[in-house]
Amino acid sequence: MRRTLVIAVLGLTATSIALGQKQSASRNQRSSVEQAIRQLDNERIQAQIGADVVALDRIYADDFVGVGPSGTVRTKTQVISDFTSGALKFQSITTDEVQIRVYENAAVETGLSTMVGQDKGKAVPRDTRFTRVWVKQQGRWRLVANHYSSQIPQH
């Protein structure tokens, strides 16, 4: 009886340690993914400001779709074309209150964005909320979707 109890306690202890290590590894992995997404988003911002086709092509997934604050829908091809033609240009983009949720091979990024730029000659809405969806494809994180909503002033 005593031997069975000792074996059971040892088994539970080993299981608890293993679960703790797995949760710690999972937390570390999430943190690593969050850092990678933040870095990629910073690269995306710089690529948009500089109309860097190579970086935009690397960051955006081939099936990307984006919805701007005015409701304009753009594919990856349209995004790259609009940046390279000058139809869409930014002088500055900053983000704040960024949160990233990681789900295995997908991540959802939300936050506030302040943009100074023009879309076909018209000023883009300056203050927006955004949602971006990132998916790990062939070992790399790629942006598959984003959506902007104009921020409504609080009363």
PLM region descriptions:
Residues 11-12:
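Repetitive helical segments and hydrophobic/amphipathic motifs
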Residues 4-7, 19-59, 63-155:
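A beta-strand edge to alpha-helix "cap/lid" segment located at domain peripheries
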